Amino acid sequence: MDAGLKRELEQKVRSGERLTREDGIALYESDDLAWLGGLAHEVRTRKNGDVVHFNVNRHLNMTNVCTASCAYCSFQRKPGEKDAYTMRIEEAVKLAKAMEGENLTELHIVNGLHPNLPWRYYPRSLRELKAALPEVSLKAFTATEIHHFETISGMSASDILDELIDAGLESLTGGGAEIFDWEVRQHIVDHRTHWEDWSRIHRLAHEKGLKTPCTMLYGHIEEPRHRVDHVLRLRELQDETGGFQVFIPLRYQHDFVDMKDGKVRNRLQARTQMATGAEALKTFAVSRLLFDNVPHVKVFWVMHGVQTAQLALQHGADDMDGSVVEYKITHDADDFGTPNKLTREDLLDLIRDAGFRPVERNTRYEILREYEGPDPARRESPQPMRV
């Protein structure tokens, strides 16, 4: 990128002018990560100061039985297959209550698209979880799951959301987005929920007063132009509804996915390494610069590793997710080398060591507690050469 284009993009960002598709592609083509990260950090600081948000949450994956066979997924199993499981609701409640003494604030629930579970299983599970943990927010179900519920129940998404909200739902999850462009999506997704239905369901959720996250799965067969298109679709929907709280880039776990036979899956598997740390940081930076109307950008440490997550905080991200606890969707792929859980103290140390001030939030991004910032005497900055 020549100096003139750099100055033009800097001026746009600093004046608050919206970046275009062409600008986004130009940013991805830049090989000056320090400049790109610095520009994204300016925007992140303007929106969120020196704060990094986190929460104390527990992920629940109540079934891995799924009708779909998406090319990127090692979580799903078919009915009767080895390692297929479906929890009784009582089991899920027991797992959730095991964290009761840790000031849990959120349950994050994502499942496979089970062909035989009745629709009533899902609102009942929310009601029983809410009854057991009334102070805990329930963030549950992807738009793909809501679309699946339409199929198995014969109900509309609007009526489904109404019943789930009545049962205690406070937010959808952001999954099922992957990459929206059909050029890529047709090769990686094996279900019927594409942009039209994904956006329809999140639009409905926003109309009903729910705030939701949105995601992008990157680092597989997509190109930078597909990432730019993905973010711009979300940005346009955010212009319309204002309902997205946070954008979450998710790094695809290449090395650990057990792909099945077939041309498409071999095409995915052909790239034997994950997106590099530098590519991950560039993705966070460009996302922060393009997605100007979303308040927060989250780095999900489970899918990036804690050191890359710390560096992402200096490249546009301002949220480090939470304690997580047993995220099967990634860890079922293989041992990715990240823990199943970080304690509150772990998160505080990681945030401070990256040079930021930790703030504990709830699902709605309401501040629960502010902590002191980094101690210069003990700060251990993340090392770029380890990314």
Swiss-Prot record:
Reactions that this protein is recorded to catalyse: 3-[(1-carboxyvinyl)-oxy]benzoate + S-adenosyl-L-methionine + H2O = 6-amino-6-deoxyfutalosine + hydrogencarbonate + L-methionine + H(+)
GO term, biological process aspect, one: menaquinone biosynthetic process
One Pfam family of this chain: Radical_SAM
Keywords linked to the UniProt accession: 4Fe-4S, Iron, Iron-sulfur, Menaquinone biosynthesis, Metal-binding, S-adenosyl-L-methionine, Transferase
EC class name: transferase
Superkingdom of the organism of origin: Bacteria
Free-text cofactor note: Binds 1 [4Fe-4S] cluster. The cluster is coordinated with 3 cysteines and an exchangeable S-adenosyl-L-methionine.
Binding, [4Fe-4S] cluster: 66, 70, 73
Family, as annotated: Belongs to the radical SAM superfamily. MqnE family.
Protein name (Swiss-Prot/TrEMBL): Aminodeoxyfutalosine synthase
Species of provenance: Streptomyces coelicolor (strain ATCC BAA-471 / A3(2) / M145)
